[in-house]
Regions:
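Extracellular glycan-interacting surfaces
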Residues: 1-340
Length: 340
């Protein structure tokens, strides 16, 4: 398989040397990649006898993945995890009951902050153009599943984030009828639309997209793109009870976002390569550079105050100076023919 046949779907370097990436190849399948030399070489580290649909790294050694595991000539939905850089994977079979959940066409959203528990949303689009979503929660130490079937949201989910066992947020791409963000305070049993986010007040037409919520040191951030290609941030400092809008907006249809901590975040305008550093818990945006080299990037991850990585579908870039300068990283993927 040639590199032309693959495209990056995510990139998360965790140190200067070690990191994870995901690529998509034929038939929507994903491969999980790992590097030990700063992104120069990547190894395919998929779980054996599996079809990977979604990867979710936690740190330099550990990652979750969702996919289908081949068991007795059957394909069963499973959550995989590794704590040794993908050298070995363990798996838990999801207690699914419906045939559509066993498909490679299922839409998947994951959220985890450690290797002790993980949230999984499986979704499908119905003939009515509405969506059906089933929510799974796994606590690995007890190997106990909590299953919430057909949660009360009918729009397309763009991300799920839990800030503790009970409080969580689902971000949507939808019409402005109520809200693009739903909140639970009972571990996903019920969800309520957040109606007082300031960026959405007074708007009745068009489509908005809320990105997956980011939670860092009590700062809750929901990046939001409005229907008029205006990008902004919604912030909360009290677990989503009250909200503040960023004092900066960007006119763009494409962005990449990363927060290293509650004090340091970045946004790239992927239409023109402008880079903004966000400080003071979101209150101050500083334009640090504009570089056409990083136009079209969609993934962005800073692992400290100065060093970050970005990717578009085919290329990888890194910065060592807060996003002021960027360098293209020449890479190769070892044994990529194994994916055929």
């Amino acid at each position: 398989m040639e590199n032309n046949d693959i495209q990056f779907t995510s990139l998360q370097m965790r140190t200067d040397k070690y990191g994870w990436a995901s690529i998509q190849y034929t038939n929507k399948k994903q491969a999980i990649l790992y590097t030990r030399n700063g992104g120069v070489e990547w190894d395919v580290v998929n779980p054996l006898n599996s079809i990977v649909l979604f990867a979710y790294p936690i740190n330099a050694r550990s990652s979750w993945a969702y996919g289908l595991t081949k068991t007795n000539d059957d394909l069963l939905p499973a959550i995989f995890y590794t704590v040794n850089r993908g050298e070995r994977w363990s798996e838990f079979i999801l207690p699914v009951e419906e045939e559509w959940e066993k498909s490679t066409d299922v839409q998947v959203q994951l959220h985890a902050t450690n290797m002790d528990s993980i949230w999984i949303v499986l979704s499908r689009k119905l003939a009515s153009n509405k969506f059906e979503h089933n929510l799974y929660y796994l606590k690995t130490k007890g190997k106990a599943w909590k299953v919430i079937k057909n949660i009360s949201i009918s729009d397309s989910i763009s991300g799920i984030t839990f800030i503790n066992d009970l409080v969580g947020f689902i971000s949507l791409q939808k019409q402005y009828e109520t809200s693009t963000v739903f909140k639970t305070i009972n571990g996903g049993e019920s969800w309520q639309a957040i109606k007082d986010i300031p960026s959405l007040e007074g708007i009745n037409t068009g489509t908005a997209m809320a990105y997956k919520a980011i939670y860092k040191n009590k700062l809750l951030v929901i990046p939001t793109k409005m229907n008029d290609d205006k990008f902004l941030m919604n912030y909360s400092f009290d677990k989503g009870n009250s909200w503040h809008i960023s004092n900066k907006t960007i006119n763009t249809s494409k962005v990449a976002v990363s927060f290293f901590s509650s004090y340091y975040g970045w946004v790239i305008n992927s239409e023109n390569g402008s880079v903004y550093q966000i400080i003071k818990k979101g209150s101050k945006w500083i334009k640090v550079s504009s570089n056409p080299l990083i136009k079209n990037v969609f993934c962005l991850h800073f692992f400290n105050r100065r060093k970050g990585w970005a990717c578009n579908k085919k290329e990888i870039f890194n910065t060592k100076d807060r996003g002021i300068t960027w360098k293209k990283v020449v890479y190769k993927i070892n044994n990529i023919d194994k994916l055929v």
